[in-house]
A protein has these predicted regions:
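Boundary-proximal intrinsically disordered activation/regulatory segments immediately upstream
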Residues: 1-68, 156-157
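Short acidic-hydrophobic, aromatic-tinged amphipathic segments that line or gate anion-handling sites
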Residues: 4-11, 80-85, 176-187, 248
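RNA substrate-binding interface of SAM-dependent RNA methyltransferases
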Residues: 5, 108-210
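Short, aromatic/basic amphipathic alpha-helical patches
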Residues: 67-78, 240
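A glycine-rich helix N-cap at a beta->alpha junction
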Residues: 75-94
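Structured adenosyl-cofactor binding patch, chiefly the S-adenosyl-L-methionine
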Residues: 103, 141-145, 159-173, 238-274
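Active-site/ligand-binding-proximal alpha/beta "capping" segment
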Residues: 203-254
């Protein structure tokens, strides 16, 4: 039977992970084994469970217990299920987007890029992308369009932050990912060196005098290719572009010279992931 706990006070400590803790507090960088993340909606929670993530607690409207969330509850063992009236839960930021169900999961132990990429042919590498919506959208495209892994540099948004998980529709649990380096100083020098040591050629998505079209045959012929994508505003750092094996552009019309990084990633993954 589900371990149901009734909540009658919005300030109850059981709601802290869902209502009051910041992303950094949830992540618990100093004690990563205590870190958690929040997944929202039955579909996203199911994908986390499918991927083997450990549920810590759930929060849902009462009507969900015998409704759409009933199957999820059978998979969560004795994790406490906090429940309350919709009127109380409506005070949670973004609750309307959750379909009435949230779940706190234990963060997994970090994995190394080398471990993830042993058999990978195509990987996405994200540099300094801090917008969680873009990170989530990139993961969704990576899952749909044949990327074997996603690597992020230390200045990127956490892929397990709440909005990134939501926008990815749970695909962040399906695509293996790892952080490439411990501090911003490890990128691009050490990060690109590690990619080369793993056998990858690197393709910087950027406009420059030496950019080749994304359908260039040499790119398709590479046995292992890392597609490097930059921050929303300024794009990739000049040092990153200069250090990559290729600089790649997407041919465009009507005088447009760039796309949002999430849109550009989808085009790049479709063309280069085939």
């Amino acid at each position: 039977m589900p371990n149901i706990v009734e909540i009658t006070d919005f300030h109850a400590p059981e709601l802290d992970p869902y209502a009051r803790l910041t992303q950094n507090q949830l992540r618990c960088r100093l004690e990563p084994e205590k870190g958690i993340f929040i997944a929202e909606s039955p579909k996203v929670i199911s994908r986390a469970l499918d991927a083997g993530y450990e549920p810590v607690s759930l929060l849902m409207e009462r009507r969900q217990i015998t409704g759409p969330a009933a199957e999820i509850l059978t998979r969560c063992g004795d994790a406490p299920v906090y429940t309350a009236d919709r009127e109380l839960l409506a005070g949670l930021t973004g609750f309307e987007l959750t379909r009435g169900v949230l779940c706190a999961f234990r963060r997994p132990a970090p994995r190394s890029a080398e471990e993830l990429c042993k058999a990978a042919r195509r990987v996405a590498v994200l540099e300094g992308i801090v917008d969680s919506t873009n990170v989530g959208a990139i993961f969704l495209s990576a899952a749909a369009l044949n990327m074997d892994a996603v690597l992020i540099n230390p200045s990127c948004c956490d892929p397990l932050c709440r909005r990134a998980v939501r926008v990815s529709m749970g695909t962040v649990f399906q695509v293996p990912w790892a952080q490439l380096g411990e501090t911003p100083a490890d990128w691009p020098g050490q990060g690109l060196a590690r990619l080369r040591a793993m056998g990858f050629k690197t393709a910087a998505m950027a406009l420059s005098d030496r950019s080749v079209p994304i359908d260039d045959e040499a790119l398709a012929a590479e046995p292992k290719l890392a597609i490097v994508l930059g921050t929303e505003g300024d794009g990739l750092a000049h040092a990153t572009i200069a250090a990559c094996d290729y600089t790649v552009k997407i041919p465009m019309s009507h005088g447009v010279d760039s796309l949002n990084v999430a849109a550009a990633s989808a085009v790049a993954f479709w063309q280069l992931g085939r």
